[in-house]
A protein has these predicted regions:
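Acidic, metal-coordinating catalytic cores used for nucleic-acid/nucleotide bond scission
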Residues: 18-22, 85-91, 183
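Conserved helicase C-terminal RecA-like lobe
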Residues: 77, 105-106, 115-181, 186-190, ...
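Conserved catalytic network of the ASCE P-loop NTPase/AAA+ motor domain
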Residues: 6-8, 49-51, 101-102, 115-118, ...
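Short acidic-hydrophobic, aromatic-tinged amphipathic segments that line or gate anion-handling sites
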Residues: 55-66, 200
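Short, aromatic/basic amphipathic alpha-helical patches
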Residues: 1-4, 91-102, 186-195
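Conserved beta-strand scaffold positions in the cores of enzyme catalytic domains, especially
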Residues: 13-15, 56-58, 109
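Conserved RecA-like helicase ATPase core segment
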Residues: 1-53, 199
Length: 202
């Protein structure tokens, strides 16, 4: 937190600036995305591997099956593939047949919140869409939510940006961000401006 001294008094800061999980390209995109918030502490990370330009890729959400087909052609049984969504009920129905359709793929599904502390070789983030079940989640509206949860930060979608940062940085090799073409998340435009490529096919 940038306000540590306000709550806990004086202290020293020791920067852990090397990551052994994700490659430099994933780190570059994730850091530039989250540090657009001026209140976010600047903490550039160095990686031991460079990563390719397409290590983070935007892809239409109707390409999930095609992506899993392609992954089954080169991912090894030891490669973990993590499929993440903002909400648990957004788990795709296609995963029910995954064991028979993609028997070689080591697939796990969980929410982004549950993925904290996890890592995988490949990560697929679902649900970059606008609306009630979107990512970023809509502003909380109920009086109960406003009373129980911390006050929102001044920078738009600050907490949701941190959540997408968590999702992206679970991956060692590649991340695909699947978006709804009809109702894309506003994060899609932000990511495009950070030179994240949009692929027509996996």
């Amino acid at each position: 937190t940038t306000a540590f001294h306000d709550y806990f008094g004086e202290g020293d800061r020791c920067a852990l600036d090397t990551t052994y999980r994700f490659n430099q390209r994933i780190g570059e995109v994730a850091n530039r995305f989250i540090q657009q918030n001026p209140a976010q502490m600047s903490k550039p990370l160095n990686s031991l591997t460079a990563g390719e330009k397409n290590a983070v890729t935007l892809l239409s959400d109707d390409q999930l099956d095609a992506l899993l087909d392609k992954l089954s052609g080169y991912a090894t049984p030891d490669d973990r593939i993590l499929i993440l969504a903002r909400y648990h009920h957004l788990k795709p129905a296609t995963l029910a047949k995954a064991a028979t359709r993609w028997p070689k793929l080591n697939l796990d599904f969980m929410t982004v919140h549950a993925s904290k502390g996890q890592q995988a070789d490949y990560v697929i983030v679902l649900g970059l869409q606008d609306g009630q079940e979107g990512f970023p989640a809509p502003e909380r509206e109920s009086v109960m939510e406003q009373a129980l949860l911390p006050q929102p930060e001044a920078f738009p979608d600050a907490e949701e940006r941190r959540l997408l940062y968590v999702a992206m940085t679970r991956a060692r090799k590649r991340v695909w961000l699947l978006f709804n073409k009809a109702q894309p998340s506003r994060f899609v435009e932000v990511l495009k401006r950070l030179d994240v490529p949009v692929a027509r096919k996996p």
